């Protein structure tokens, strides 16, 4: 990290909070398009999650862009001239895209250095496993079984660009950088309006940074409120003076009544709360009463509306009781299941039965939503009946088969943690029969005649890797029994979800 700071000459810049001069350094562009910062902080930074941006780099283009940045009047061009004006063979839109990517990289630097310093002296073992989507499910299976309620929160987005600028002002004190940031945002709106009839213009790295910085600011305030309100859960976080007075009373209360009223102290302990954020949602699991869950619900509403100036309605926060309601989480339907367990005990000549109930988190496959996705992409109809994929009939037989096999294995790989595999087998059946119908349609034949000509070897291609591994690990009798039907496997190599059709 020290070597990296010296290379960037960033110590003096960071002390003065001046980031704008870095826009005129050529090696910063090398860093942006060579993934240097991403390789250095691969296991540390939470802001470098997406590297799917333009990797093209040319020193000549960079020098031209820096010259244009010195000549500010030539950089600002009306929206109607974005497509016509060009500078040495490149449109102005190309340079705006470069500036937006560069801005995301430059502003990531102080966040990455600050986050890296917080991990100094700490050993993170197997941190790559924590990057997997499946890594959260074993944690929830261990924790949610002891909780009662879950808050399912839809994180709101600010509808005005100035809210994003104001949020970033708490982290970046450089006025010039904030002006460049505001310039990129408003120019993006001009691009969006100008190209609204064409393919939309996206900059994943730039907008990923905006989203992460926005959520990071919200979470920092939320965790502060969580710590400050743990002993005073019924008092609003806005009444600070009453809270300070109440803390003094708590200290006196603990000293006087600690020996006489030990049961009352349970009300003053911090509640067990677990917070998980995924995609555009977050969940808050706790073992509180319905009254306290409603208080947490309006905590979120007041936080977004009063501090972030974002209109946030209470119906976007759902209170789910785990014993009755299903929690839709990362493509799974999770709920608590009671597993009765009868234990026979014998003492001397007397024997008796003990009924125990074990609470377990049950994760199931949302078959209706998956069938809806398959029907949307023309693999089946809305009832789940397989149909031929007409748009793929122009491809070769091997290409069609490989596409279906890849989709089938990806779905089977992701939903291997389901407690019941019946719905997974139904999805496999839909994809297999859709593949056969597509090939039969291409060869202008019926499904029966096509299978009779090729034999059953075609369907063996859909045998997933985990099926092959389990058949080697477990005995044949166990593999053929229903016990393997309940085997749950969580993989720690799933870092993102692929598109159903377009992923290659």
UniProtKB/Swiss-Prot annotation:
The answer to keyword Chloroplast applying to this record is yes
Q: Name one GO biological process term.
A: tRNA processing
The disulfide bridges present are none
Q: Where in the cell is it found?
A: Plastid, Chloroplast
Recorded GO MF terms: RNA binding
Q: Name one Pfam family in it.
A: MatK_N
Its domain of life? Eukaryota
Q: Which UniProt keywords apply?
A: Chloroplast, mRNA processing, Plastid, RNA-binding, tRNA processing
Q: Name one GO cellular component term.
A: chloroplast
Keyword RNA-binding applies: yes
InterPro entries referenced in this protein's UniProt entry, alphabetically: Domain_X, Maturase_MatK, Maturase_MatK_N
- Name the job this protein performs: Usually encoded in the trnK tRNA gene intron. Probably assists in splicing its own and other chloroplast group II introns.
Tell me which family the UniProt entry assigns to this protein. Answer: Belongs to the intron maturase 2 family. MatK subfamily.
Supply the name of the protein: Maturase K
Species of origin: Turritis glabra
Q: What is the lineage of its organism?
A: Eukaryota, Viridiplantae, Streptophyta, Embryophyta, Tracheophyta
